[in-house]
């Protein structure tokens, strides 16, 4: 049963909401537009706020639902393990030729299930950095770095610390190209309403 739960978590994570929303709602393959990424940020840029929001919420719910599977089926699997497996599915989805997202929203969904207050603090860090920098990628990495610092130095929850270290490493690894573009000052910025650049 443990293996079945982990397989189900991976399959949940593999649901490519960006691909589904693009093809069903707009008749396009989101992987062929913008950055080519299946995540919510690229969907926002290519298809707009409505589609982007749907994808982000869907990607988050994958993590939340996957983390809840052990409880729902009364299986002795740690929710953070099931959630981490879903994040792997999100990054390397079997339903989308293993070309997936950058682990941010699904990781957030895992944290939402495990510790809602911690999740809210992550959102706060993300929004503050986004307001200052206008870089979604930098804001995501800043939230991941905050999560690492907080769990390593300010909590005794070992499973959470291990999970955060793993998920943060996923996030930084998947943002390698973004880091280079930030350094080169070619990374796209969020355009606030009323702002020209």
Curated annotation (Swiss-Prot):
Its main localization is membrane
Task: Print the keywords alphabetically.
Answer: Cell membrane, Lipid biosynthesis, Lipid metabolism, Membrane, Phospholipid biosynthesis, Phospholipid metabolism, Transferase, Transmembrane, Transmembrane helix
Q: In which pathway does it act?
A: Lipid metabolism; phospholipid metabolism
* Bilayer disposition of the protein: Multi-pass membrane protein
InterPro entries according to UniProt? G3P_acylTferase_PlsY
Q: Where in the cell is it found?
A: Cell membrane
EC numbers on record: 2.3.1.275
Could you list the residue ranges that cross the membrane?
Answer: 1-21, 69-89, 110-130, 152-172
Pfam families assigned: G3P_acyltransf
Name a single GO cellular component: plasma membrane
A Gene Ontology molecular function term of the record: acyl-phosphate glycerol-3-phosphate acyltransferase activity
Q: Which reaction does it catalyse?
A: an acyl phosphate + sn-glycerol 3-phosphate = a 1-acyl-sn-glycero-3-phosphate + phosphate
- Domain of life, per UniProt, equals Bacteria
The GO annotation for biological process reads: phospholipid biosynthetic process
Cited function: Catalyzes the transfer of an acyl group from acyl-phosphate (acyl-PO(4)) to glycerol-3-phosphate (G3P) to form lysophosphatidic acid (LPA). This enzyme utilizes acyl-phosphate as fatty acyl donor, but not acyl-CoA or acyl-ACP.
Its family remark reads: Belongs to the PlsY family.
Quaternary structure annotation from Swiss-Prot or TrEMBL? Probably interacts with PlsX.
According to UniProt, the name of this protein is Glycerol-3-phosphate acyltransferase
Species of origin: Geobacillus kaustophilus (strain HTA426)
